[in-house]
Amino acid sequence: MDTPGSLQVIAIISLLLVGGASQPATFLEKALPTDGPSLETIEHKTEMVNTTRSEEQSPVRPSKTRQQLIDETPEICANAWVIRLITEFPTELGNMSQKQKTIAIQVHNTTMTMEETVFSLVSHVNKKNYEIHNVSGICTKYQLVPGNFTCSTRKCISQTKEKRIISTTVKDTYEVYLPFAWSQKPTGGDKYPEPQIGYNTGTGRLNQWNKDEFVIKQCRKKRGKRQITVPNSTLSPTGTTDFTKFTPNPISPNSTALNELEQKTTPIGTEQPFNNEKWQNLIFGNIVTKMDPQCEAELFQQFNISDKTVQVEFKVTSLPGQNISCQAIYNTEHGINIENKNCVISLIKENRKIKAHAYITRTGSYEWYAQQVTSKGIIQEVRNLVTIVECECPIVKPLPQGGIIPLTMPMRVLTNPSPILIHSALKFDLSKFGLSPCSFSPMEWQTYITKPLKRAMHGFEVHQRKKRDLGIGLHSTLNSWWNGANSLGLTVESADRQKYDQKILKVLQNLAVQQRTDVKNQQTLGKALETPIYTITLQLADSLTAAILKHEQQQNVGITCKDIAILTVTQIATYLRDIQHEHLPVWFIEQITNQILLPVGQVIMPEITAPPILNPLIGWNQSVLVIGLTHQLTITTVQQPLYKAANMGNFQDWTPFPPFILANKTHGFSIDCPIMRNSFLCHTLPTPVKLSEWERSTSTIYQTSPQVWITPEGKACLNHRNITVQDRTCLINKPGCFIPKHPWSAGKQTIVPTQYIQQNFVPDTIDTEDNQTRVLQKEMIEAISKAKRDYGVLKQGQIALIRHHEAITTILGQEATYSIKETQALISSIEQEAWYNNLFSWYDGSVWSQLQLIIVVITCTIPLLWVLNTCLFFKLRRAIRRERDNNIVVEYQAQTRGRRTHMTEPITKKQRAKLLRHAKTNRRLPRSLRATPAVSAFEMVTFDPQEETVEINRIDPSHENNDHGGPMNMAPIISADSYALPTPYITIMLDRELLNQGMRKVITLLNDPAREVFNKAYNLVTTNHFTLAYGCDESAGWVNQHAEYMGKPVIVTLAGLVITPVGLAWIPLPQQEPLEKLFMVPNSMPHVTVAMADYHETKEMGKIVKDINNEELLLVKPQLFKWGPEGFFVACPLVIRGVVTGHSLLHIACPATAVQAEGT
């Protein structure tokens, strides 16, 4: 440590608040670690001062008197204490081992019976640089608490939670100011104890510093309204901006909140219990991020605001002087005010979001600070440290001839688009409405269904001359929707039909292979479509349910089938008018590509030349409402990444100059393709031309028009005399080329760095703030697992549909047809062959069929057995007739529009078992169990809605929209009559979509150990809810006490997710009304079960959450905590709306005797 140098100290200070022993332990108070991070985490950043001294100079020692040092100590905190320490770094450091290289500056209270550390500044040693990492305070009688202060050029400005520590280092001598405050005043005649300061090298003993090396000073108490002085604003007409009204915590002087704020400057007593505000401080703990040095920085920060938000502030300050370079403040009372001086900042408010962008180009060190203040104080703080360095001026090399002007980054190119239709089905359980049987005449169907739907969907119709149907039959009629739910159908449209047929039939073959796999796994058709069906179902179900509830409320009469028809058509049509192509996310389309096994080099994307939804189909019977949707997508071929550019010079064979070209480093061609989802979508690509063949004579262009372009070697070339970066200009003596390392400006053009041009461009498929691809894929797998549990094994009719689809696909793959007529003729021949196959389907491998086969062979040579053969033939024919009547026989009738099909009686139990056994083993079916390859269909009256449908989710009519501006996915609102019979459950049903959004954030915060525990619970809970009461008697008692809450909305604030090997559960903030008041489940705590591990039940989760509350909570990384021996906790605050309901989760009610007993 003899080498002179500078020391940069970054201190992250955490002052731990622990309640006194006299009060009972509250929620999480027991779990609070005594040696971990505090509940009020404050982050400090030191101001570095570089000084040097000679090798011969002795360490700096205080030469002034103690009183002079006290007087010179700055007033950096109001109503608190400050320690000023000037000393050498301990010499024992050199003798310490690598594991012991930690030094603690400790403040001890010598007046106590036991010597306890009340303030420690822990620093870790890395070579010759000492970085202060953590400050914590622990004491039982006199506790250190954070003061409300800040320090700027040695001038105190009282501020809510912003703090600084000044550290000046000179070799191994340093000066540190440590602010602190006592948690309570001394009782009786006691005085404040004078702490002693020392260091601990890991040996366990305290080495004290000489008193001449430090002073302890009590700061004067300051009062008055707090304000911030900032540079003049460019927005004010007078040149100055009054920022006094934009305070970090703007409160009216006459309000009671001001008195509460002043009380916060007084140390908090140890007897104060753990409360919500401290819990939120844990959740929204400050995070300091140090960014890599760069030439220029573009900073971004976004906050979600609420009705309680008072002010949001963003600012960039230069270091070490803390001068404000630019600042933007949004205040709910005074609006937006922006100040730009040495950087540029912009502020955008969209709905409930505040977004800020700051652009810095001047060299130096800066702090990017953002905070949100609510009526309860600061709830969010973000700090980023960034250093701007000077960019190097380029050295140009001789300028070549020709080139192009780059306009975009390299982007993916997609060619040869061919349409593909993806079908999905949506079902509603109408039995929940208690409807009488519905019966429609053809005239009523036309009046209430066909005509309104046609008028509403007129803009989505496809021109018939361009439409070509391969005849797969999965999208022709409502019946096909009924049977082909969750299935995949294809329709082709192309000018070159023969060429396209050959390509698309290959896709159909691969689709058949995938469907065979689905049968083997006992999954429904179209496995890749289950998750998007679920998403679309939520949207349409909300619209449908909201319309029906609104109608019920207005009419106050029993709803009829015609009402459902009109409202359904109107709401769905209105919704589909505004739907956009982005309703299908890129990750979903990629999953479709993987599931149907597209050839290498082909992808699926939305169709930009047609509406995304075509011809919705709607139908219902007494118990089920079915909606069929057709999504139009495009299959394209992926080419290498190219970038769009403007032509400089011209190609030899092209006249006139093409205005735009697509090019890579070596070739280019003239075309102007539209951009969709960060890709160029081109119908065809011309033959590319080498860039080396550009016109050589370009001297005229050089003289008359300054240009910037890219050479075939990937260099940036220009004929400008100068280029600009940051706030300075680099002079260029002559035109030339160079390899850019940073963004540069030349005239109106920007030089793109070659490292960006030469690398492959990866389109941004997910939210730019956080890549959630892996999370969404996991959700898809979970949705598939849920579908398996809900639907179980396939019905016989669905298996027949798969076999038929496979047969037609295979035959069509062998013969490419040229027209619709030929395709229909081919399918008709297939149907005819199927009839013959059914006639000769007597051989199924049984003993009788084997015996008849032997007899047939023998009868060819032995005529004497003809009589026996005739007898057996008549016997087998009767068996065939019975077997055929019980088999899945489907008849096909060709019509001009669609197909009309029906299904005969179901097969026997014995045949059904044999059919399922063959489906599981993926073996070829016996002929006796094969269905005719016609379009299988269920009659609507035979459909069982209890097995394969989802019930309609209703919402509270008084709350039609949630915070996101759309209808909510709420629990069913039970009628008043249903409350007369109590159910075993009283719950708060929650919005699953919001919980899913929170889950996506949680997963990004997990480390490997937490993720391993997280993955153990994969059995999802179908309904997300708080259980308030359980049991018939308990539920009845709950209703008697809290009847006014039944059916009403409740706002709940979730604190985060508890992760245990048994299961996952959200837990709310403690002491939250009215949840604490309504919760009446013994031996449990309020929680929302999300998923459970195998061999565990949901009822276990309440005890698990209650038991883990007694464990310690240890910080792993920001927002992730170790809780208990195997559990974890992820802090993820989420405000969610629920509805209190007595709806039985298991669709059961309490016995009538319990109701009578309650009534008596």
Curated annotation (Swiss-Prot):
Signal peptide positions (record): 1-22
Keyword annotations from UniProtKB, A to Z: Cleavage on pair of basic residues, Coiled coil, Fusion of virus membrane with host cell membrane, Fusion of virus membrane with host membrane, Glycoprotein, Host cell membrane, Host membrane, Host-virus interaction, Lipoprotein, Membrane, Signal, Transmembrane, Transmembrane helix, Viral attachment to host cell, Viral envelope protein, Viral penetration into host cytoplasm, Virion, Virus entry into host cell
Transmembrane segments: 854-874, 1049-1069, 1128-1148
Quaternary state and interactors: The mature envelope protein (Env) consists of a trimer of SU-TM heterodimers attached by non-covalent interactions or by a labile interchain disulfide bond.
PTM annotation, UniProt: Specific enzymatic cleavages in vivo yield mature proteins. Envelope glycoproteins are synthesized as an inactive precursor that is N-glycosylated and processed likely by host cell furin or by a furin-like protease in the Golgi to yield the mature SU and TM proteins. The cleavage site between SU and TM requires the minimal sequence [KR]-X-[KR]-R.
One GO cellular component term noted in the UniProt record for this chain: virion membrane
Lineage: Viruses, Riboviria, Pararnavirae, Artverviricota, Revtraviricetes
Cytoplasmic topological segments: 875-1048, 1149-1160
This protein's name: Envelope glycoprotein
The gene coding this protein: env
Region (Disordered): 230-251
Glycosylation site list: N50, N95, N109, N134, N148, N232, N254, N304, N323, N621, N664, N722, N771
Gene Ontology terms describing biological process: fusion of virus membrane with host plasma membrane; symbiont entry into host cell; virion attachment to host cell
Extracellular side of membrane: 23-853, 1070-1127
Coiled coil regions in record: none
